A protein has these predicted regions:
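Short helix-initiation/N-cap motifs at beta->coil->alpha
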Residues: 68, 84-94, 139, 174-184, ...
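Periplasmic-binding protein-like
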Residues: 126-133, 181, 198-244, 260-266
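Extracytoplasmic small-molecule ligand-binding "clamshell" domains
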Residues: 29-107, 116, 249
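A ligand-binding cleft/hinge motif common to bilobed small-molecule-binding domains
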Residues: 91, 108-116, 163-166, 187-220
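Acidic, polar ligand-binding/catalytic clefts
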Residues: 72, 76, 81-146, 212-213, ...
């Protein structure tokens, strides 16, 4: 091989390596969701928007609530703004899988089953599965076994439905796509009990001025984390870093006390 041919071969090899590295870098950047979020300056967050005090529409029609505030704080730590996308619960994780959402911040309980499909941040609230009844019925349904044969309302596809079917298969399970209808059916007597997040139950008792009541201690402990698609370690690390910061500087506690008058974050 002549010197000129050798030189051409070397230049072609160098060019190939350079182009290959560039394409690899572009592919990695395309796959790095955190980088995409920072580049766009926007993170798409899924929440229900009908689940007070976590997310709901205020008197002006604007989204408000604990998880609305929390989403905005998280987005700021990621160098972006939160694009809040109200989504029904039974489709919210599917929207995450199909990449219509980047994150779901909607009291998604961390469970071993869900961890097979999604990654979760560290927990940002700690609660439990709470039975909520009409005032005066507290003693009737204060244990899981007392729900056998009883009309129990749960959100469709929620961990409450799953827990009820697993632990009280004799219950008369009534599923709902939205919370307002479920609460209305309890008040009107169409169902006897609803299973909800303990924190949401406290809020409902306050709003109904004592027309509803908790049956006692929660039936099971649950922790909620931010759900995201697997394969985004940089984003997961950034979320955990933000949550740890908010926990350490008291931001999470203040936010909790604003919406629940108690610290529900640990």
């Amino acid at each position: 091989m002549t010197f000129s041919a050798l030189r051409r071969h070397f230049l072609l090899a160098s060019l190939t390596l350079t182009l290959g590295a560039g394409l690899l870098g572009q592919a990695q950047a395309a796959d790095d969701l955190l980088a995409q979020i920072k580049s766009k300056g926007e993170v798409r967050v899924g929440l229900e928007g009908t689940y007070p005090p976590f997310s709901f529409q205020d008197e002006n029609g604007k989204l408000a609530g604990f998880e609305v505030d929390f989403s905005n704080l998280i987005a700021k730590e990621l160098g972006a703004t939160a694009k809040l996308q109200p989504t029904k619960w039974d489709g919210i994780l599917a929207a995450l899988e199909s990449k219509r959402l980047d994150l779901v911040i909607n009291q998604v309980t961390i469970s071993e089953e869900r961890k097979k499909k999604y990654d979760f941040s560290d927990a940002y609230t700690v609660s439990g599965i709470q039975a909520l009844v009409r005032k005066g019925d507290e003693g009737k349904y204060d244990a899981p076994e007392k729900l056998a044969g009883v009309k129990v309302g749960v959100g469709l596809g929620t961990n409450y439905e799953q827990w009820l079917r697993e632990h009280v298969p004799q219950a008369d399970v009534r599923t709902y796509e939205d919370d307002p209808t479920k609460f209305q059916d309890l008040r009107s007597g169409r169902i006897d009990v609803i299973l909800v997040d303990r924190l949401a139950a406290f809020d409902m008792v306050n709003k109904t001025k004592g027309a509803m009541a908790l049956t006692g201690a929660p039936f099971a402990r649950q922790e909620a984390g931010i759900a995201l698609r697997k394969g985004n370690p940089e984003l997961l690390a950034a979320l955990n870093k933000a949550i740890e910061k908010f926990r350490a500087d008291g931001t999470l506690k203040k936010l909790s006390e604003k919406w629940f008058q108690a610290d529900v974050t640990q």
